[in-house]
């Protein structure tokens, strides 16, 4: 139970870390049998250029048109797995889970929440990242302090000031950058399910010309 609570808290912190930088975040449903090797924990979207109007990001239509003309991707999509400070074999398992669940996206990233792994484990993760192209970042925080933070639900619901204070507790340390690859045009249709819901949301945002809020944030599948 404590392990599930810690993982939920780590996931909530990762979501808020991404969405406070203006990225779109889609949260996949949690598997009842543990972490999934088919789908990641999050999909993180790098939106097209635009300007904020109130709480909505409105896309620059001329920039979108230029992207279409040169065949550039309309947006970036990153597949993200979140781990609660794995070590040794657990760290490698989480890395390969990230690799396995990111084949559909432009890149994959493993986010470790907790204390920074030791030097040998960091070196091992960097070596794997260099070979397979998966990014690795640690949101560093002492275990004792992480336990003192509010629960996952409170972190998800935190207002701007409260969220900023929570994220100030974290020190992002990038161990390796992701390697980008091409995204297949029919990925959403091919995978279906939650992936289909994700790509339907993104398509609706492009058609509307602005970010359309994903109503439930957490997938209802």
Please name every model-derived segment.
Residues 44-79:
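Active-site beta-strand-loop-beta-strand hairpin of nuclease catalytic cores
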Residues 86-91, 104-142:
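Nucleic-acid nuclease catalytic cores
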Residues 1-56, 221:
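Acidic-basic catalytic patches of nuclease active cores, encompassing PD-(D/E)XK
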Residues 89, 93, 218-221:
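Capsid-like jelly-roll
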Residues 78-87:
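Glycine-rich phosphate-binding "P-loop"
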Residues 125-221:
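Non-catalytic C-terminal interaction segments of nucleic acid-processing enzymes
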Residues 101:
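Conserved nucleotide- and phosphate/pyrophosphate-binding catalytic cores
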Residues 63-65, 94-97, 118-121:
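Amphipathic coiled-coil/heptad-repeat helices and related helical stalk/stem segments
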């Amino acid at each position: 139970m404590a392990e599930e609570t810690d993982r939920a808290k780590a996931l909530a912190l990762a979501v808020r870390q991404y969405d406070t930088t203006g990225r779109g975040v889609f949260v996949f449903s949690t598997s009842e049998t543990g972490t999934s090797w088919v789908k990641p924990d999050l999909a993180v979207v790098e939106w097209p250029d635009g300007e904020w109007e109130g709480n909505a990001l409105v896309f620059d239509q001329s920039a979108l048109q230029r992207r279409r003309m040169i065949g550039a991707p309309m947006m970036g999509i990153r597949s993200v797995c979140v781990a609660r400070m794995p070590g040794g074999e657990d760290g490698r398992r989480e890395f390969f889970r990230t690799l396995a669940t990111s084949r559909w996206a432009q890149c994959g990233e493993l986010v470790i929440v907790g204390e920074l792994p030791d030097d040998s484990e960091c070196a091992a993760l960097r070596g794997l990242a260099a070979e397979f192209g998966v990014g690795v970042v640690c949101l560093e925080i002492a275990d004792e302090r992480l336990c003192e933070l509010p629960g996952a639900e409170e972190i998800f619901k935190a207002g701007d000031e409260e969220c900023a204070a929570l994220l100030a507790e974290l020190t992002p340390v990038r161990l390796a950058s992701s390697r980008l690859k091409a995204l297949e045009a029919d990925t959403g249709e091919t995978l279906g399910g939650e992936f289909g819901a994700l790509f339907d949301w993104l398509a609706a945002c492009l058609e509307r010309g602005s970010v359309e809020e994903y109503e439930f944030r957490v997938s209802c599948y």
